[in-house]
Amino acid sequence: MPPPPHQKPENVLKRAHELIGVNQAPAALTLLHEHITSKRSRNVPIASLEPVMVLLVEQAVEQKKGKLAKDALYQYKNIAQNTNVGTIELVLKKFIELAAEKVTAAQQKADEVQSSIEATTGSSSVEDLEASETPESILLATVSGEQSKDRTDRAIVTPWLKFLWEAYRTVLDILRNNARLELLYQSTAMQAFDFCLKYARKTEFRRLCELLRNHVQTAAKYSAQMHAINLNDPDTLQRHLETRFQQLNVAVELELWQEAFRSVEDIHTLLSLSKRPAKNIMMANYYEKLTRIFLVGENYLFHAAAWSRYYNLLRQSAAMLATGQSKKSDSPPVSEADLQKAATFVVLSALSIPVISTSRSRGAMVDFDEARKNKNSRLTHLLGLSQAPTRSSLFRDVLSKALLRRASPQIRDLYNILEVDFHPLSICQKISPILAQVGADEEMQKYILPLQQVILTRLFQQLSQVYETVDLEFVQSLAQFPEPFQVTRGTIEKFIMNGNKKGDLAIRMDHATGVLSFDVDVFSSAKAVHAGSAAGSAENESGSVQRLQSTPSQIVRSQLTRLAEVLYTTCRYIDPSFNEARINARDAVLARAKAGAEKEHLEILSRKEVIQKRKDKASEIQAQKEKELARKKMLQEQALQQAEAQRLAEEQKIREQKRMAAEREEIKKKEVEGMLKDMKLDDVELEDLDNLDSNKIRMIKLQQLEREKNTIAEKLRVTGKRLDHLERAFRKEEAKKLPEDYAKQRERDIAAYELIKAQTLKEAELKHKEDVELKHRLTRLMPFYESFRADLHERRRDMFEKRRRDAERELEKQVTLRRKEYRERKLREKREREEKERALREAEERAEREKEEEKQRQEARKEELARLREEREKERERAKEAQARQQQREEEAMARRRAEKAAAAAVPIREREPFAATGSGPRLPLAGTKSTWREREAAKAAGGGAPSDSGPPPARAAPPPIERTDSRDRPAAGPPRLALAGNKPSWREREAAKNAAGGAPPPERSGPPPRVASGRGEPMDRAGSGRGGDRDARDNNGPAPEPLKASGGPGKYVPKFRREG
């Protein structure tokens, strides 16, 4: 079955509106979807396809058909992305706007429903005021009353929220990894973040973050595709950074700390790819969010490090703004209050870092330590630090940058109490008012608990140095904090147990007596734990705890060390050989070091050179690889662009051809429709228009004209007949009323005339009176007018005369100037005319000279040709003379040969039998059987006359070999004759033989008769042909011919020496 015919977008749009008008919106949506997803729609102009897509989006949103909209949007993006990106942005924005409007409308509807429910509940009458609250009503209110709003939202708002979320995800999937649509992609991601924040959609926010993360990975993987985004582009990377910072802000606002931390990692990854440094305002936001993330995760060490980085950035931004090195828009707003607040939090967060280990257990395994190291390394990289921070390094940084002077006074006092002059017995009394001030601040209140842990750690560490046992009540009295931060006994016990578990404390507690016993085992190695348990703490740092005195266990642990030191000192002072051996060993070591220092230095230098060469070579290889990859990528992109351009050109050409064909068809159809409309043929269906051609339309038109002509003629006949009777009746009745009507009309005309006449006379009289009054009033002003006019004329006369004289002078000046210009122009024209005449005359003279020269050259050429002609004539005469001499020599040679032949003919030969006696047939004229004229002439010369027929013919000698003629012996004209043996003599030879014989007829021979072609009759008479007879007659009648010259034809062989003589 053939596919259905493809409809135009205008017809599809019209049909869809018709379906929507009759409440068939699903059918309209299906029609629009099928048209968009059809393969034939790829060649349709985008301008006509855009309204179809907009209507499809509207209907898809109305009917919640997200999948249909997604499919159509993907297809529309593939169609329009290479020609018009703006239409894609328009359709996608429309899609999101409609979905957002639906969510807003659903929210308003839910609010209205909830308010109506509350109003109905509030206005309901209560039957019994004393028993208004029944058990049933309480249960119903508990189960359904408080949840009514949630149920309303789930029923009305949630479906549209889900649809809007799907719309955002669809649009982001369509726009991903496309450089042309990158701006819309970023703005859509921002709108999606605002959607998650506005409606507190935490689950959707996690999915959105994962979706954007996958998009970035896909972009890096498929970077070679056409129109793919380039993360190495600074602008593209900057836009992705802005999106990730917005993601971080929303994650913090929603308190999704895990997503916030992953967003921080994403930002750090993008920052590592960026070639340009990030803006200070963005980095300030980055570090500020890190402080909140680390505080929630109770990682106080990196929390303090983040505050330190934040303070350094603020101070750097302030310095750059003061020197003008940075724009105000690129830097965070920095004031003295901001710096003081940041310094306060740096010190407070550093004080809150736990002194002891924060690990969960003492027996940390190696794998756990490795994982912890990796985590600390990641966090260090996130903060941009070269090494992991420590509590002591942070305090050194605080002291080196004088943050204590900038911090608030209470935090400065807190630092002095905890780190400078810590005293366990008076610590709580000194620190209570400070903790009260810190607890009053909402932002600082979060540091109370870690500060308590630090205070308790220091308290127990110093108590263990002084006491062996201590009462728990005494410890509780020492650890007195202000309300509501009071520490209970259970808290202290829990702290002691955690410290023992992690190996930082060695305390035994007797619950029966309430006594705490510090570890007095002199061989205890509680502190000898691996360094991994101290990560993020300061228990292994010297000076972290103020040392009051050494404990017995510390004395026992250091006993061997002290013994070794004492023995070494004793030996050094008592035994001289010990010192000598030590000095000799040291000198030997120094000598060896000095001897090998130069060599080691050279080896180090050579190793450095080798390393540097290898680095340079590796960098060159890497640069070449990158250059080659860039070149290949560029060539690939160029090839793709060319292929794409060619494809687009072909598609455009095909679309243009189809469009023109469609336009022609449409014009033809409209012309047919217009003709049918002019003919008022409403019974022709639209489907029949394609079957109508010009002949059919002409026939229809002729038939229509014939019908109209007949109809009009019939109507005219009927109407004329009716009008004739009616007009006759009207005139009969009118003739009776005409006199009366005439009299009435005359009276009306006279009355109107009298009325107009009276009005005209009255108006003329009034106007005359007004004019007379005006004349009398103006007459009184005439003397003043005349005097003013005379004064004005006097004043203006002088001015007029002055202007007239000035005008005359100006006129004379202009006339003189014009005359001067006219003379100059005439002179210039005369000079130009003379110059042209001179140039023309020179051209004519030059042409004449050239003509004379050409004539002389032609005459010289003619003289040269005449001279050459004379030379050729002379050459030709010389050639003729040479030829004549050559002919004379040849004749002489021929005469000698004839004499030789005549002498040879006198020798007797065998007599031949006559032809008649043999009785055989005529002898064939074979080669060598017939004598030539030279032979006959030689025979005559030898015999003295013609031989008789009765006598036997002389014997013929064998034909001599054919003489070879060279190219110089050829005749002057024509190719050389073939020298064949026994050829028949030519007519010239025969004529020469006649002349030599004195005109006598040829002798009769007893031999065979002359050869006559059998069956040919008599020989041809050539008398009138000019080829033989006439010439014979002329030769016979004229003077005796000159001796014949050698013709250059074939003959007997003549030796060379005879030819020369």
Curated annotation (Swiss-Prot):
The keyword Transferase does not apply. InterPro entries: EIF3A, eIF3a_PCI_TPR-like, PCI_dom. GO terms for biological process: formation of cytoplasmic translation initiation complex; translation reinitiation. It is found in: Cytoplasm. Residues 828-901 have a biased composition (Basic and acidic residues). Residues 609-724, 789-906 form a coiled coil. Residues 114-133, 828-1061 are annotated as: Disordered. Residues 950-962, 1000-1011 have a biased composition (Pro residues). GO terms for cellular component: cytoplasmic stress granule; eukaryotic 43S preinitiation complex; eukaryotic 48S preinitiation complex; eukaryotic translation initiation factor 3 complex, eIF3e; eukaryotic translation initiation factor 3 complex, eIF3m; multi-eIF complex. One of its GO terms (molecular function) is mRNA binding. Belongs to the eIF-3 subunit A family. RNA-binding component of the eukaryotic translation initiation factor 3 (eIF-3) complex, which is involved in protein synthesis of a specialized repertoire of mRNAs and, together with other initiation factors, stimulates binding of mRNA and methionyl-tRNAi to the 40S ribosome. The eIF-3 complex specifically targets and initiates translation of a subset of mRNAs involved in cell proliferation. HAMAP family: eIF3a. This is Eukaryotic translation initiation factor 3 subunit A.
